[in-house]
Amino acid sequence: MTAADAADAAADAPAPPPAVETDADVRREIIETVRRFVAREVTPVAPDLEREDRFPAEIVAQMRDLGLFGVTIPESLGGLGLDLRTYIGVIEELAYGWMSLTGIVNTHTMCATLIMYHGSEEQQQRWLPSMASGERRGALSLSEPDAGSDTRNISCKAVRDGDEYVVNGTKAWVTNGERAGLVALAARTEEGISAFVVEKEPGARFEGIAVSKHVGKLGYKGVETVEMAYTDHRVPAANLVGEAGRGLPQILGVLEVGRINIASRAVGVARAAFDAALGYAQQRSTFGKPIAEHQAIQLKLADMATRLEAARLLTRNAAERKAAGLRCDVEAGMAKLFASETALELSMEAMRIHGGMGYTTEMPVERYYRDAPLMVIGEGTNEIQRLVIARGLLARARSTGDR
């Protein structure tokens, strides 16, 4: 199966029930609370954390106190029970301050979403309360060194042995992998690719699981991205999520939430780049006047603002559709594609507007420029997104249903 087939596979998974829409006033209050938190606690320290590539332990503890690890988890299971519209607003604000924080939340949320959508009641009761509180952090483990967008190459195996599965293989690009207590794992079983939740203690080694490599990155600093090697690791059969052989469509459906997250964090980075450019253009003067009064700069600012607003609306549309329980592979792909390209373009334009200062580490725009490419590549490259979008559109055109 190629990633272009992913839309069809995800559509085979049972649709989640429509979420209860969060009251608009509550949504605004939550997002404003996060905005103030970012301005007070994140923005002042982000440059140092970025430079040192240091995990933001104190900020993560404060995020736990705010309930940000349980935004979409139902209140009955200890979460805030908020909708995806609220979630993307939270992610945008975190990305505005420091994009790395959104990675800490995103893979955790995707792991929790897999359990919410496809886990049994017993599994939900067992895992989600500690995830909602942030006591246990989650990770998602789909990609492998030789299997990224081409999911047919997944080689990690889980072999049934009585009441357990024995897992062997290597997973790549695992965000939160070392610090996670729960890992949503895609592994090949006799029936096909199946989804499991692996329980582990945070750390580099645990009962046949080893962090075999820490990946150095251009941006996205402070959060670990690792390879994880499984050697005869035993997973209880009770940790199988849903039916054996149905893991791929389940996880690909969850990746729609991941792509909406990528889009919202791209909006946050793009907004930060735009605000930096707008502010600097009014402060910096050339030829006797602020550069904001030069027509060339005004044209750039107009285009930047327009793309930013379009990216935000595409992301909101995808979130609303997902929350309504509708298929949104096309909409999530469009949002991810456009918003990530917008973040890349706006970070470059912001650097150009800053001139030489934009190339220095004294200004935050160089960080936006380093962070933006992750959104173009992550959760399926933009080339793959275009294929998913096109296939989805053609499928809808052939259908008498949604067009």
Model-derived features with residue positions:
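Long, acidic (Asp/Glu-rich), low-complexity accessory segments flanking structured domains
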Residues: 231-250
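A short core secondary-structure module
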Residues: 163-164, 168-210
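Alpha-helical interface subdomain recognition
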Residues: 1-97, 101-102, 118-123, 130, ...
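Short glycine/proline-enriched turns and hinge-like loops at secondary-structure junctions
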Residues: 82, 150-152, 176-180, 221-223, ...
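Flexible, small-/acidic-enriched active-site or ligand-binding loops
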Residues: 153, 203-236
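N-terminal glycine-rich flavin-associated loop
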Residues: 103-122, 148
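A short, Trp-centered hydrophobic/proline-enriched beta-strand micro-motif
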Residues: 134-142
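Short Gly/Pro-enriched turn/cap motifs at secondary-structure boundaries
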Residues: 104-105, 131, 146-149, 173-176, ...
